[in-house]
Amino acid sequence: MKIAFLDIETTRLVADNGLGFILCCSMKIWHEKKIKTVRIDASKDYKKCLYNDTFVVDGIADWLIKEDPEVIVTYNGDFFDIPYINTRRLGANKKPLPPCRYMDHFKTSRYNLKLHSMGLNAMAEHLGVVHHKTRFEPIVWQRAMFGSKPDLDKIVHHCELDIVVLEECHDKVLPVLRKLKGVL
C-alpha cells in the first residue's frame, strides 16, 4: 500500500480572511528518503505578491496526483491541514484535493494512546523517536510571512522535520491501530 505523509506551515489558523496562507508543504512517501517541499517563495510571482499561495496549493495537488497514494498520513490533518489546503484551493478557483483515504495520528494520540498531551511532540518524546520537532518564537513566522528568506528557510526545515518525526511515530504506533488490521 502506498502511503504519503503531509504537513503544512501557515501564517494563521484560518484560511479565508486574507491573512492566512500556506508558507510551505512537505510531503513524503513512506520509507522513501526524498521529501518533496513546495514553498511559497519558489513561485515566479512571489516578490509581487507575498501572500499568493496558489503555487503551493497547485504543487500539493500535482504531487498527490502524480504519486497517487492510497493513504495520506497527517497530524491533525483532518481538522487543519486538509481543510486549510482545500479552503485555499477553492478560494483560488481550483478543485479540492483529489479523493483519498486519510489517517490522522492526532486521532491516534487521542483515541488509542493516553499521553499527557495530544501534540506530535508528546507522542514523539514518549515513543522515543530519533528526530525531534523544532520550536520557534512567533516572530520567525511573522518575518517569514513578510518575505524573510532566512526565516522561511527555518520554517521549511521545521516542516520537513515534522514529516520525518511523523513517519517515525507512524511506524511505532501501527501495532495499536486496530482498525487497520489486515490493511497495513
Regions found by a protein language model. Give the residues of each.
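Conserved beta-strand scaffold positions in the cores of enzyme catalytic domains, especially
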Residues: I3-F5, I35-T37, Y102-M103, H131
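Short amphipathic alpha-helical segments
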Residues: N17-G18, I85-T87, D171
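Conserved DEDDh/DEDDy metal-dependent 3′-5′ exonuclease domain
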Residues: K36-S117, N121-A122
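Acidic, Mg2+-coordinating catalytic module of metal-dependent nucleases/exonucleases
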Residues: I72-V73, A122-L184
